[in-house]
Each structure stands twice: as structure tokens, then as C-alpha cells.
Regions:
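Bacterial N-terminal signal peptides that target proteins for export
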Residues: 2-11
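Bacterial N-terminal signal peptides
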Residues: 10-19
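Transition segment at domain starts
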Residues: 23-52, 87-88, 135
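Short amphipathic, basic-aromatic surface patches that mediate peripheral association
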Residues: 56-62
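Beta-strand signatures of extracellular beta-sandwich domains
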Residues: 71-75
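Solvent-exposed strand-loop boundary residues in beta-sheet-rich modules
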Residues: 76-80, 120, 134
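An anionic, turn-rich surface loop/hairpin at beta-sheet edges
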Residues: 80-106
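Short, exposed beta-strand-loop hairpins at the edges of beta-sheets
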Residues: 103-129
Length: 135
């Protein structure tokens, strides 16, 4: 009986540590200003770290522009622009899905702005800024 209690105690402590760790990781979030632009002008973007990876995620009220190739772009504090993934991805049976979250590659040292860019027309659709660059 004592052994079972010890096992349950160990599992409870481990579960608590995992919960606290994931909660602490989510506490370190950064929210941008609202998107401003001709086609992308709703919602915000949030930056957070998850499992050691830098993640950007648009808010629920963000509407992906109805353009041929809306794409995630990141601008760093030096003004360098990095093109990431497309917002629209092909789903099953010809349907389209939205990529509302993207991993930021480790070679990007900081994030000052997030842009929505039409890769087909090569035009900026909107952008959102952080109050200070995120490292």
C-alpha cells in the first residue's frame, strides 16, 4: 500500500511540474498592435515560446485576406525581411485550410513586425508591430 501511495505521489508531482512549466512558458507572451493595411486590418498576432520554439499565432478575429497567396513575413529590428509560410494551405479533397500559426526559424534574431504579404502580386497587405523587438 505504501508503494502505491509513493507511485501516486511521484506521478502527481510530475504532473504538477509539467503543468507549471507549460503555464510559465505561456506567460511569456507578446501581443502586437492590430494589423493595419489595405487587406489585412483585423486581429493581432501573439508571440510565445513552446518546447523551445518561437511561435507566432494570429488572433481569432484575424481574417486571412482573400488574395491568391497571402504569406507570413517577419521584419527584424534592422529592417531585414524574412518570408515564412503561406497562410493558405491545400487541404484534403481540394479544400483550403488556414495556417494561423507559424514557427519562427532560429536564424531570425528578433521580431519587430509581422506582415501579411501577397507573394503572387508582391504587395504588402498589412502589418502589425510589437511595442519593442522580441528576442
Amino acid at each position: 500500500m505504501k508503494q502505491i501511495n509513493r507511485v501516486f505521489t511521484v506521478f502527481a508531482v510530475l504532473a504538477l511540474l509539467v503543468t507549471v512549466n507549460s503555464f510559465a512558458a505561456r506567460m511569456d507572451t507578446h501581443m502586437s498592435s492590430q494589423f493595419q493595411g489595405p487587406k489585412a486590418n483585423t486581429g493581432t498576432v501573439t508571440h510565445f515560446a513552446e518546447n523551445g520554439k518561437s511561435i507566432l499565432k494570429v488572433s481569432a478575429d484575424f481574417k486571412v485576406p482573400d488574395t491568391p497567396a497571402p504569406t507570413w513575413r517577419v521584419v527584424d529590428s534592422k529592417g531585414d525581411i524574412y518570408t515564412l509560410d503561406a497562410f493558405k494551405i491545400k487541404g484534403t479533397l481540394g479544400t483550403n485550410a488556414e495556417k494561423r500559426e507559424v514557427e519562427v526559424p532560429s536564424y531570425i534574431k528578433d521580431i519587430a513586425k509581422v506582415q501579411v504579404y501577397c507573394a503572387w502580386a508582391q504587395v504588402l497587405l498589412g502589418e502589425a508591430s510589437f511595442s519593442s523587438p522580441i528576442k
